[in-house]
Amino acid sequence: MSTGKIVQIIGAVVDIEFPAAEMPNINDALVSQEANVTFEVQQLLGDGVVRTIAMGSSDGLRRGMVIENTGDAIKVPVGKATLGRIMNVLGEPVDHGGAINAEDKWSIHRAAPAYDELSNSTELLETGIKVIDLLCPFAKGGKVGLFGGAGVGKTVNMMELIRNIAVEHSGYSVFAGVGERTREGNDFYYEMKESDVLDKVSLVYGQMNEPAGNRFRVALTGLTMAEYFREEGRDVLFFVDNIYRYTLAGTEVSALLGRMPSAVGYQPTLAEEMGKLQERIASTKKGSITSIQAVYVPADDLTDPSPATTFAHLDSTVVLSRQIAELGIYPAVDPLDSTSRQLDPLVVGEEHYSTARRVQGVLQRYKELRDIIAILGMDELSEDDKAVVTRARKVQRFLSQPFFVAEVFTGAPGKYVPLKDTIRDFKAIVDGEYDHLPEQAFYMVGSMEEAVAKAEKMQAEHK
């Protein structure tokens, strides 16, 4: 094992000099026993000097400190021993639960599956959330993006998806918290504990307050754990909150390494780094990784290079809208902006497809009529348009749903709605079968039976 010495420290970037014949390779892990910090080699500068990123605070480091080369990339524990545990970017436990006795350790840098190993299953993954199952269904082994600005509910939606899928489908999940709030990570841990699904989830956190190196690599740590479960032949879920912070950490690292920035100050290697991560999130003939990724949209601008680069890799996009959140409709999913490759009659069936398109058609017509209503009022509309508007308002409210993970805030018990019920109920609304019910009865309920019961209760209170 070769040793070198620190020659320069600039924030998280540390230059280390080795004997010319014993230079480490790119992505090798170097360790300081004295400061208990791991470094990852990013550039070979020549004359025996390598430029590295510290996977921890560089406080306490000094020039001349001895650094050892491990001769390998960062390796993290994988397998069942990681379930129910919180780990950092190096796979070390941070939950005071003792050591992780994993049967194996894998490198966080791995090649994507070969082309002939990939599978192309079109099986649907039912989430129990009406608006998602109807309008932007998820594929088992697909990639989903939850797009939204600050505070529109990305993390809450993700927590609900983990809870529903873990409880209803009983599969393993890996959650990578990339550069998010420590408070959310804490809430998330206790939410999983209360829902009795913690023993099926591996948690890997690289929070906002951690150095850029940790935030940049923590997604790869989580992905490596998910890949192990896939290679065992399992169907695993991989959650990332938040992909934007992964890009942002890459931008910080890139600037520290002295690379020239590209559009909007992002790193020039943005598309390559995103591709390396996303291409590994794949389903093979052995097992599948279904990935759900929260994507923060800076200033609600979907054309920003970071969300725009992410779009290209996804099968389904769930766009969370501030305008819908302002109406008090949660989940605040935009039914006209959200898309899915699975919404195809050959995949979901003719009834599901036609119901989804009719729901979108009604909402689109309502959107067009809104300006006329604002200027002239409802009375100036034709009878057909009046019917469209009342149905659209009912559909809009029926797309809301009480969440299990938000019970403490809303006071309403959460609801899981099977897909067949969702299709039946929305078809009935657009067919006009429930034109006699008040629109308020459709707000924050699960199935149509609840909406009818709510309407009867409202009528009884009015008498």
Swiss-Prot record:
Highest classification ranks of the organism? Bacteria, Pseudomonadati, Pseudomonadota, Gammaproteobacteria, Cardiobacteriales
Nucleotide-binding keyword on record: yes
Q: Which Gene3D superfamilies match?
A: 2.40.10.170, Bovine Mitochondrial F1-atpase, Atp Synthase Beta Chain, Chain D, domain 3, P-loop containing nucleotide triphosphate hydrolases
Q: Which NCBIfam families match?
A: atpD
According to UniProt, the reaction catalysed is: ATP + H2O + 4 H(+)(in) = ADP + phosphate + 5 H(+)(out)
Establish whether keyword Nucleotide-binding is in the entry: yes
- This protein's species is Dichelobacter nodosus (strain VCS1703A)
Q: Name one Pfam family in it.
A: ATP-synt_ab
Lineage top rank: taxon: Bacteria
EC assignment: 7.1.2.2
| UniProt-annotated binding residues for ATP | G148, G149, A150, G151, V152, G153, K154, T155
- What gene is this protein translated from? atpD
Quaternary structure and interacting proteins, as annotated:
F-type ATPases have 2 components, CF(1) - the catalytic core - and CF(0) - the membrane proton channel. CF(1) has five subunits: alpha(3), beta(3), gamma(1), delta(1), epsilon(1). CF(0) has three main subunits: a(1), b(2) and c(9-12). The alpha and beta chains form an alternating ring which encloses part of the gamma chain. CF(1) is attached to CF(0) by a central stalk formed by the gamma and epsilon chains, while a peripheral stalk is formed by the delta and b chains.
Q: Which GO terms describe its cellular component?
A: plasma membrane; proton-transporting ATP synthase complex
Name of protein: ATP synthase subunit beta
